[in-house]
UniProtKB/Swiss-Prot annotation:
<dbReference type="InterPro" id="IPR017867">
    <property type="entry name" value="Tyr_phospatase_low_mol_wt"/>
</dbReference>
<dbReference type="GO" id="GO:0004725">
    <property type="term" value="F:protein tyrosine phosphatase activity"/>
</dbReference>
<keyword id="KW-0904">Protein phosphatase</keyword>
<dbReference type="InterPro" id="IPR050438">
    <property type="entry name" value="LMW_PTPase"/>
</dbReference>
<keyword id="KW-0378">Hydrolase</keyword>
<protein>
    <recommendedName>
        <fullName>Protein-arginine-phosphatase</fullName>
        <ecNumber>3.9.1.2</ecNumber>
    </recommendedName>
</protein>
<feature type="active site" description="Nucleophile">
    <location>
        <position position="9"/>
    </location>
</feature>
<comment type="subunit">
    <text>Is present in solution as a mixture of monomers, dimers and higher order oligomers (trimers and tetramers).</text>
</comment>
<feature type="site" description="Important for substrate discrimination">
    <location>
        <position position="13"/>
    </location>
</feature>
<feature type="active site" description="Proton donor">
    <location>
        <position position="117"/>
    </location>
</feature>
<dbReference type="InterPro" id="IPR036196">
    <property type="entry name" value="Ptyr_pPase_sf"/>
</dbReference>
<dbReference type="GO" id="GO:0098627">
    <property type="term" value="F:protein arginine phosphatase activity"/>
</dbReference>
<feature type="binding site">
    <location>
        <begin position="10"/>
        <end position="15"/>
    </location>
    <ligand>
        <name>substrate</name>
    </ligand>
</feature>
<comment type="similarity">
    <text>Belongs to the low molecular weight phosphotyrosine protein phosphatase family.</text>
</comment>
<dbReference type="InterPro" id="IPR023485">
    <property type="entry name" value="Ptyr_pPase"/>
</dbReference>
<feature type="active site">
    <location>
        <position position="15"/>
    </location>
</feature>
<comment type="function">
    <text>Catalyzes the specific dephosphorylation of phosphoarginine residues in proteins. Probably counteracts the protein arginine kinase McsB in vivo. Exhibits almost no activity against pTyr peptides. Protein arginine phosphorylation has a physiologically important role and is involved in the regulation of many critical cellular processes, such as protein homeostasis, motility, competence, and stringent and stress responses, by regulating gene expression and protein activity.</text>
</comment>
């Protein structure tokens, strides 16, 4: 079964594009990845620090932000939000997505918890977010490969 993973954060310039780039970098067969934001401006690049901390891991992030739309929801098999607030907003706007929408932490480890927004912080805060995401994306990749 192909997986179409949609990562969602606020502005689609930090957390969700980092998560998407980390998962795409694994080049898992049968896994497609997109990202969007609940309050995103269309067409912005990923933040400078987000691109820098990905580059430290050898990952180039060619990304343009996108506002979350019905087409994203219809495309996705799994909608993975960065926070419970994002998850609640997604389900409120798109009730049909309820059964496929989770926080990333909930989906990979069954625990509640948000991924802190590094927006506007120093590069160390972005590194911490990247490292947390990297651990979660490793678990996500294992889960997807096990379920295929």
């Amino acid at each position: 079964m192909p997986y179409r993973i949609l990562f969602v954060c606020t502005g689609n310039t930090c957390r969700s594009p980092m998560a998407a780039a980390l998962l795409e970098n694994k080049q898992l067969p049968g896994v497609e990845v997109k990202s969007a934001g609940v309050f995103a401006a269309e067409g912005s690049e990923a933040s400078v620090h987000a691109k820098m901390v990905l580059k430290e891991k050898g990952i180039e992030a060619a990304h343009r932000s996108s506002q979350l739309k019905k087409e994203h929801i219809d495309w996705a098999t799994h909608v993975l939000a960065m926070t419970s607030g994002h998850k609640d907003m997604i389900v409120e706007r798109f009730p049909e997505a309820k059964d496929k929408t989770f926080t990333l932490k909930q989906f990979v480890s069954g625990t509640d918890g948000d991924i802190a927004d590094p927006f506007g912080g120093p590069i160390e805060v972005y590194r911490a977010a990247r490292d947390e995401l990297e651990t979660l994306i490793d678990r996500l990749a294992e889960k997807l490969q096990t379920e295929q």
